[in-house]
């Protein structure tokens, strides 16, 4: 069976928390799954993302903060940070979607004050992953 046109709610597409948009469900608007630490998503080409996250990690660690990175299986060994966690493989976005909640909770368990995360392509499942991540990060995004 084929569905007709699918419309995405404006609360999901918004890149800011807009008080004028009424959320139909808690995960559509608010800092859903948000870790206690300040989370920032870094977007761009892989090499630049890795370089920027490593720079940010060094900066925050030198200031004495607890820092963590949310990476993928493909890149996790390339980060120079005390706490690097893989959320899954880019080859199977389902593994990322399935592991996202647990990895965000783990950030609280390790006491991460600053969390830097890779971004994901916003195609089918990637759009849902990024929606949750953007809300968890309160829309803190760096483009490199």
Summary of predicted features, one role per range:
Residues 1-10:
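A conserved active-site cap/scaffold subdomain adjacent to cofactor or substrate pockets
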Residues 13-16:
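Conserved catalytic/binding loops enriched for acidic/polar residues
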Residues 21-138:
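A C-terminal functional module that forms or caps the active site or interfaces directly
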Residues 141-144:
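Short, flexible loop segments at boundaries between secondary-structure elements
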């Amino acid at each position: 069976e084929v569905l007709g046109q699918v419309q995405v709610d404006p609360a999901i597409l918004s890149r800011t928390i807009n008080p004028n948009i009424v959320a139909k469900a808690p995960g559509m608007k608010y800092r859903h799954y948000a870790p206690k630490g300040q989370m920032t998503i870094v977007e761009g080409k892989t090499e630049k993302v890795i370089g920027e996250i490593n720079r940010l990690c060094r900066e925050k660690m030198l200031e004495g903060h607890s820092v963590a990175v949310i990476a993928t299986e493909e890149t996790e060994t390339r980060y120079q940070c005390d706490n690097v966690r893989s959320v899954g493989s880019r080859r199977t976005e389902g593994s990322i979607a399935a592991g996202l909640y647990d990895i965000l909770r783990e950030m609280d368990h390790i006491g991460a004050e600053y969390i830097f995360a890779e971004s994901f392509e916003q195609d089918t499942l990637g759009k849902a992953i990024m929606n949750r991540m953007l809300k968890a990060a309160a829309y803190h995004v760096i483009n490199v």
